UniProtKB/Swiss-Prot annotation:
Residues 337-348 have a biased composition (Acidic residues). Residues 369-380 have a biased composition (Basic residues). GO terms for cellular component: nuclear body; nucleoplasm. It holds the Pfam family ARS2. This is Serrate RNA effector molecule homolog. It comes from Drosophila virilis (Fruit fly). The keyword Ribonucleoprotein does not apply.
Length: 963
């Protein structure tokens, strides 16, 4: 290494450089060390690689120098013989980036550790952390870059059999070793389950799963959601909505309409609210312009009659059209198009009153005015809409004034007629008010159909009030004329006139879009706004989030997902609001709040992009459709039985004749499991389902004609659709999607969908079918789909008492006895204390009696806690920390038991040395020098198994390896 360094310095050396630098005072000052020395040679002593500080950036020779040099980076080599240490030119290759992470280490890898002992130790500990019983890497260097991986919680590593033998006596027998190791593994599992239960028993998500009271309440709530969904589905099934749609991607609009209908019904909507689905969907950019447009429309409607908005409404009143443009349609029209098109409408309205010679001037004036308006509209702001709109109307040309004047002169007579009709309505209202304490509101004809509907509702209310007044006693009715004689009648008529005037003014104001919107309009209950919460601590409850969200108007519900171990048991949440709220403002205010010192990470949740998504088109084939019907029926029966949807008490009214079907039809099914379809279940979707499960084939015809199936397998056959089977399958698929939130063609379930922003959001449908399909493809598809849906076919069976006893189940009476003993303290002879109340007794039996009488609620809490823990153990899919990677790989392989259901271990027997290590030189050299028997010691018969050989082709032949 020294020769190469010298060669490097020789090539870079300048012959007279040292002499030039010696006569430059500034360079001499730079060459001096910080401590101040007379000669640059004073710093040579600092080049000792073992005298540097930990802050040095160099490698093995990292001394604390003011100006690092190339020699600082090349290790503890000899110092250069020529040249100055303060070289200006940078080195050819700098090694510092490789050592930059040394600041993150408690002990630097280089400098103080020339033999890399610490680095080897870190690497050993990270790969073999089983000896330290740690679930995280012990090295700061390895844990710093991988923060996400280090946060993943796992169980501590379980001792391997080899490590467990190190803790036992050397004279222990093999059977005793295996017995103790089995007990160790059982105790280890019990301890992990108990620790996990204690860590999460106070969290809401855990209580909703296993607490004896909270879990029952949660299950009843979910069952209520399912019953509500079932009622909605039956309603849609009866009115033909379900039967009129097919689950094909080509009918995406119809499927979306069915899903939206379900959502509106689930939200408590009526048939009137379903009319919102007939309106055209509002595009996103138009929705953002609605706010400025509505304010502008209200300003225009309150102006003088030269407003174009007013002329349009008066035009509708003049022509007595039964339908008026709805406010939604007006809001969908852009502002520019509204101002550009009103001149053409005025031309049509004022055509009889026009002068023939003014046509050209009107057109030219209108064109100029349009150009001016467009320029002004680009320059104005939203704050001065009123002033700019007024200025635009005042800048009309003379021809426009004549045109508008002619138009409004025609309409003045109509206004006079309307005033006369209004006066008649006032007189009629005054006459009716004499008999009614509440005067009815008289609608104006200018309001169109929207106002007529409102007037009809008010008239119905007045009729109801009249009926109530007619039912009053005769004494109260006799008092009314007496009161009228005393002078109350003129006061009442004056009040009625004032009220009718105010109502008439209100009716004229309802021409505005905002006023019309306040009338009875269909509600878009299927559209919501929502906020997504990225981080929710496990300790945060749903009630705390609801307390924050109820302060905002339009709050509907909140949904919280189950925690994930990958996210350190943090959860995600969705907050749902109505569509008309300012969701961004609410999201901003939520981001400025912290709940239990946790940033929720609120962001605006976008709407669903594609609600109907295509699945494989091969699903439309007749054979696959029949297999899907069978699978859907099994899934529906399993889920109905799990939630007890169609029990005898709930279904007696819905299907009274279900049991009257002959049992002989059960033999028509394929297999014994198909006999339960439509007979044991009261579900109308499963009625007569066995008729569609019978497979049909022309086997005899093919045999007689000699038609072989080889040609079909090679070339394939076209897709065969059976519309009758497809209609049955679609009814089952929609039942699973609407009632149980199971997307069949996506083979998944959407959990807690009733609390999500979209209650029926996404559905997968059959895509476009291929041209041909082979029988092999059909069989593979059916088999693969059956495997994907096994999670819905398997029944959830809880563990038995014997099984949970092995996991450490607790006995309620035993735990109560422990509770009594823990609260019985002996102070002195014949002097005992109860810590629960602080009272003293003469004996423990008195404390026991006192606890059961005065602290019965504490005893009940102990019993509930025991049931709480046992419910957690009974769940076969209970949440728990994942096993340590080392434990999961070596637990069964090195135990020597070889239980069924596991792969055969790939390691040698537990007493053999691992691969890659040489055997001990002495007989007793194994396992730390202890005197163990030879490596190939015999095991008892119950633990012996056949050894499986793994031969290396390059290794020499060893014939007696498995003797």
């Amino acid at each position: 290494m020294a020769d190469s360094d010298d060669e490097y310095d020789r090539k870079r050396r300048d012959k007279f450089r040292g002499e030039r630098d010696s006569y430059r005072p500034e360079r001499r000052d730079e060459r001096r060390p910080m401590g101040g020395g007379a000669n640059s040679r004073d710093e040579w002593s600092e080049r000792n690689p073992f005298r540097g500080s930990s802050a040095a950036g160099g490698g093995g020779g990292g001394g604390a120098r003011h100006r690092p040099d190339y020699s600082d980076y090349r290790g503890s080599g000899p110092r250069p013989r020529y040249g100055s240490p303060g070289r200006e030119m940078p080195p050819a290759k700098r090694m510092r980036p490789d050592w930059g992470e040394s600041e993150m280490r408690s002990n630097p890898r280089f400098g103080y550790d020339p033999y890399l002992v610490q680095a080897w130790n870190d690497h050993y500990q990270s790969l073999h952390s089983a000896y330290s019983h740690s679930s995280h890497p012990s090295s700061a260097r390895e844990s710093a870059p991988n923060v996400v991986n280090s946060d993943t919680q796992t169980q501590p590593a379980m001792l391997t059999l080899k490590q467990f033998l190190d803790t036992q006596d050397e004279n222990i027998s093999d059977s005793e070793v295996m017995r103790k190791y089995t007990e160790y593994k059982t105790d280890f599992k019990r301890q992990q389950l108990n620790e996990f239960f204690v860590a999460h028993k106070d969290e809401e998500w855990f209580k909703n799963k296993y607490h004896p009271e909270d879990s029952v309440r949660r299950s009843e709530e979910q069952r209520g959601f399912l019953k509500r969904r079932t009622d909605v589905f039956l309603e849609l099934l009866e009115n033909g909505t379900i039967g009129s749609v097919k689950v094909d991607s080509s009918q995406a609009d119809s499927l979306v309409r069915v899903l939206d209908t379900c959502v509106i019904k689930l939200e408590g909507g009526t048939d009137e609210d379903l009319k919102i689905l007939d309106e055209k969907p509002k595009e996103t950019p138009v929705v953002y312009e609605r706010k400025s447009e509505s304010t502008e429309a209200s300003v225009v409607a309150k102006r003088e009659p030269e407003s174009p908005k007013q002329t349009k409404s008066e035009k509708g009143a003049d022509e007595e059209q039964p339908v008026v443009v709805s406010p939604q349609r007006k809001s969908l029209r852009p502002v520019n198009s509204d101002e550009e098109n009103w001149d053409d409408e005025n031309d049509e309205m004022a055509a009889p009153a026009k002068v023939q010679g003014d046509d050209d001037s009107i057109k030219s004036g209108s064109d100029k005015k349009l150009k001016k308006k467009k320029i002004k509209k680009r320059n104005r702001n939203s704050s001065d809409d009123e002033s700019s709109s007024s200025s635009s109307f005042e800048s009309d040309s003379d021809s426009d004034d004549e045109k508008l004047k002619a138009k409004y002169d025609v309409e003045e007579g109509l206004r006079a007629d309307q005033k006369a009709e209004a006066q008649k309505d006032k007189e009629e209202a005054a006459t009716v008010a004499k008999a009614n304490p509440l005067p009815p509101d008289s609608p104006q004809p200018e309001g169109g159909t929207a106002l007529q509907d409102a007037a009809a509702i008010k008239s119905e209310q007045s009729d109801e009030q009249q009926e109530k007044d007619a039912e009053q006693p005769a004494e109260l009715q006799a008092d009314e004329p007496a009161a009228a004689k005393n002078g109350e009648e003129p006061e009442k008529t004056e009040k009625n006139e004032v009220e009718t005037k105010s109502t008439a003014d209100d009716v004229t104001e309802t021409i505005d879009l905002d006023k019309v919107k306040d009338g009875p309009q269909p509600r878009a209950l299927h559209r919501t706004s929502s906020i997504f919460l990225r981080n929710l601590a496990p300790s945060i409850t749903k009630a705390e989030i609801e307390a924050i969200c109820t302060r905002f108007s339009g709050y509907l519900r909140v949904a919280i997902a189950d925690p994930l171990v990958e996210r350190r048991w943090y959860r995600r949440g969705w907050i749902t609001f109505t569509r008309d709220v300012n969701i961004k403002e609410i999201c901003w205010s939520l981001n400025n709040q912290r709940l239990r010192d946790c940033e929720m990470g609120a962001i605006v949740n976008r709407d669903l992009s594609r609600r109907v998504r295509p699945a494989n088109g091969i699903t439309a084939h007749k054979q696959i459709v029949r297999a899907d019907i069978k699978l859907c029926a099994k899934i529906a029966m399993n889920l109905d039985e799990r939630f007890k949807l169609w029990s005898e008490a709930d279904s007696t009214q819905q299907q009274p004749d279900a049991e009257s079907k002959p049992s002989a039809d059960a033999t028509n099914g394929s297999g014994g499991s198909s006999t339960t379809y439509g007979f044991n279940s009261k579900n109308p979707v499963l009625q007569n389902i066995t008729d569609y499960l019978i497979e049909e084939a022309s086997a005899e015809e093919e045999e007689l004609l000699g038609l072989a199936g080889d040609n079909k397998d090679g070339e394939g056959e076209p897709i065969e659709r059976d519309e009758q089977l497809i209609s049955v399958l679609d009814r089952l698929v929609l039942y699973l999607r609407i009632v149980h939130s199971v997307d069949y063609y996506n083979h998944c379930e959407y959990p807690y969908e009733d609390e999500m922003p979209n209650r029926c959001g996404i559905i997968h449908a059959r895509g476009p079918p291929p041209m041909r399909v082979t029988s092999n493809d059909v069989q593979e598809y059916i088999k693969a789909y059956d495997g994907k849906l096994q999670q819905f076919l398997t029944k959830s069976v809880q563990l038995s008492d014997d099984e949970i006893k092995e996991l450490g189940a607790k006995n309620p009476e035993t735990e109560v006895e422990k509770f009594v003993q823990a609260n019985t303290q002996e102070l002195a002879k014949d002097k005992w204390l109860c810590p629960l109340s602080g009272k003293k007794f003469k004996g423990p039996e008195f404390i026991r009696k006192h606890i059961f009488n005065k602290h019965e609620e504490k005893v009940d809490e102990v019993r509930k806690e025991v049931q709480y823990f046992n419910n957690y153990l009974r769940d076969p899919k209970r949440p728990q920390l994942p096993e340590h990677p080392g434990s999961s790989k070596r637990t069964e392989s090195e135990s020597g038991r070889g239980s069924g259901g596991y792969r055969p271990p790939m390691y040698p027997p537990f007493s053999a040395m691992p691969y890659g290590f040489a055997p001990p030189m002495m007989g007793g050299g194994g396992r730390g020098g202890r005197n163990f028997p030879p490596v190939r010691r015999e095991m008892p018969l119950e633990h012996q198994r056949r050894l499986i050989g793994y031969h290396d082709l390059d290794a020499p032949v060893n014939s007696d390896m498995f003797d």
